[in-house]
Amino acid sequence: MSRGKAVVLDLETTGLNPRTDKIIEIGALLVEDGEILDTFSTFVSPGRKLLPQTTEITGITDEMLEHAPVFADIAEKLLAFLGEHVLLGHSIISDYAFLKKALVNEQPKGFAFERNGLDTLKIARRFLPAEQKKALSALTAYFQIPHEPHRALADAQATFLLYETLWDLYEEGTPSAFIPFPLHYQIKREVPVMPKQIEQIRRLLEERGIPCDRDLSQLTKNEASRLADQIRSGVIKAPSDE
């Protein structure tokens, strides 16, 4: 059975929830039959300051994102790179969910981003002992694969090498474990922030002496409503009040 062509994908994000968190880095490899044909790598502006724990986990800082494009500016180039290829990742459904949400909200109404996937986490769970940790960093250490964790392109490269290792070890005996499967994630297209919401948030921030740490124009309508509620309730407050 041929490995075929696929895009190895890894994202760094502001958190774990695709409905509320944002992509901050994309790393992808176009591969075929064990060879890397092309790469795609970019930072992405989330439109807001990073939380300290995000920087601690990813190593990505606000300064690194200062001149990064917003997702809308790289969406078409990314789509061209992805083509209709199978998506390969470690816990691929998580990255697929973030990517689908971002793409659906930037493309014309009716756009569908449906793909098949391969998951090194799923494959590892099938063949490795239960006591063996299955995080990407744990598996690369287990198989002695070079890896600089928590940066998108480095994680994509490590995932590719992990897949190649798993293929060499287990594909001949269990080829069914390496058959792509449909990825499923339901996402509702979001409504962009309304101008009156931006004005309202700016007024609330000014009244309370709170600095604006995000690009309000990048919010969705629901995000703007949540932000206004957080300001009113005191969840978000001026630095002098903390």
Question: Where in this protein do the model-derived segments appear?
Answer:
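Active-site catalytic microenvironments for nucleophilic, acid-base chemistry
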Residues: 102-105, 126, 142, 165-169, ...
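Acidic two-metal-ion nuclease catalytic site recognized across multiple nuclease folds
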Residues: 162-242
